[in-house]
Regions:
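Tandem repeat domain/solenoid detector
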Residues: 1-2, 15-18, 36-40, 53-58, ...
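Low-complexity/repetitive intrinsically disordered segments
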Residues: 1-3, 13, 151-153
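Beta-rich catalytic cores
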Residues: 6-7, 37, 44-45, 75, ...
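Intrinsically disordered, low-complexity repeat/linker tracts enriched for polar/charged residues
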Residues: 9, 29, 47, 65-67, ...
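Conserved core positions of repeat-based scaffolds
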Residues: 9-12, 21, 47-50, 59, ...
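Acidic glycine-/aspartate-rich tracts in secreted/extracellular proteins
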Residues: 25-26, 63-64, 101-102, 131-132, ...
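Surface loop/turn motifs at the tips and blade-to-blade linkers of beta-strand repeat domains
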Residues: 32-34, 70-72, 108-110, 146-147
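Blade-level signature of beta-propeller repeat domains, shared across WD40, Kelch, NHL, RCC1
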Residues: 136-153
Length: 153
């Protein structure tokens, strides 16, 4: 994604692989001026995540729940920042997650054959290669009730 916004700040990915950010910087989530070789970005509640061309990940901002502890991630294809957690899709179709796990939103270690991910406020959703969807996390409003979904692109 070339732009990402949440809460009170906005992040943009430039064509040259650098990143710009404006807005609330209370947690340092806009401190992206030194990022290079970025191919994707995602803004979380108080943190920003960037995917580098080499499959590694960078993050800045709120560390209170370890949602920025992505520095050892490798072979990442996509990233998504949630409220207080961060999710990464690996090239092999598995998923990694760090951060607040109060509602099991980071319990993605057993996911396989995933082709897309999205981190919600307190939940995480994954699209599988066969068009089905998996979800974990807070489900008070049924936001994780996707087990019957098929043919999703």
């Amino acid at each position: 994604m070339a732009i990402s916004a949440v809460g009170y700040y906005t992040v943009g990915l430039k064509a040259d692989g650098t990143v710009v950010a404006v807005g609330d910087n209370t947690d340092g989530q806009c401190e992206v001026s030194d990022w290079r070789d970025i191919v994707a970005i995602s803004a979380g509640y108080g943190h920003t995540v960037g995917l580098k061309a080499d499959g590694t990940v960078v993050a800045v901002g709120d560390y209170n729940y370890d949602q920025c502890e992505v520095f050892d991630w490798r072979d990442i294809l996509a990233v998504s920042a949630g409220s207080l957690h961060t999710v990464g899709l690996k090239f092999d179709g598995t998923v990694v997650a760090v951060g607040d796990n109060s509602y099991d939103q980071c319990n993605v270690a057993d996911w396989r054959n995933v082709v897309a991910i999205s981190a919600g406020y307190w939940h995480t959703v994954g699209l599988k290669a066969d068009g089905t969807v998996v979800a974990v996390g807070y489900n008070e409003f049924g936001q994780c009730d996707v087990s019957g979904w098929t043919n999703i692109k």
